[in-house]
Amino acid sequence: MPAKEGQTDAAPGTTGQAPPPPPATGLEEILPGRPPLPHAEEKGAFFVYQRELAPGTRLEQYEVLSVLGSGGFGITYLAKDLFLNRNVVIKENFPASCSYRDPLTGHIRPNNEHDLENYTWALKSFLSEAQTLAELNHPGIVRILSVFEANGTAYFAMEHITGLSLDYLGEKLHTTGHRYTEDELKGLLTRLLRILEYLHASHIYHRDIKPGNILLTEEGTPVLIDFGAARHALKLHTATVLTTQGYSSPEQALGKTNIGPWSDLYSVGATFYALLTGHPPERAEVRLAEDAMPPLSLIHI
């Protein structure tokens, strides 16, 4: 549980004596040198809890500049590579539901022994994302630069792309009353489908395509980011189903494993529906029961 304010000499219900060492966790096999899982009594609510790393924090050769985003599985930071003098994006493994940041050391630790299994799964999934990105080499896919261990967890650094997400751009356009032109949409769709052509030829499915995971560079080039849900075609039978309402395909929404290129293509269609209308389509599982979503031809856009 997150730490709270208030300091005491000993945690409630304890004698103030040091607790026995915690049992081995097995995480050492994934992250050698990782601090041991804390005993429950060691997690007394003594300090103000801070989830994100502060600006100025050093991670290997990188210095944290600011927080870019925070989700259920981790935090992304804008950082500077002090050796190469360039900005990068760093992703930190920090599954919110089963871990916390030690307020004294900054280390990420499972909440308790019961959360250890979920934390281990999240860590393996995080490293799998890094390995997937390392297999890919395409101008429309974010490049991974390095993977490293710090603060008892895993990080990876990616290229920093100067651009804005389609989510932000779409919202901005609809707020101001502007629209994409037909030629702009055709060009964007063509370039995005070429990225998917390469990705699927590599036998990898993204599984989480949506406006927020597509960046548009200053030159107008789409770049696919966030491969946390991506899986190799041969590993889908062991993949956990992750969904985003409105953008996930019917097979994903129903928790099935028959994921394929068609799944990503459905999400692309949903993405462009959102760009045209200003909102995502109805959830796939709802549409399967009763598809009352009006076609674009009936919507004034």
Language-model features: where?
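Activation segment signature within eukaryotic-like protein kinase domains
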Residues: 188-189
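Catalytic-loop of the protein kinase fold
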Residues: 200-216
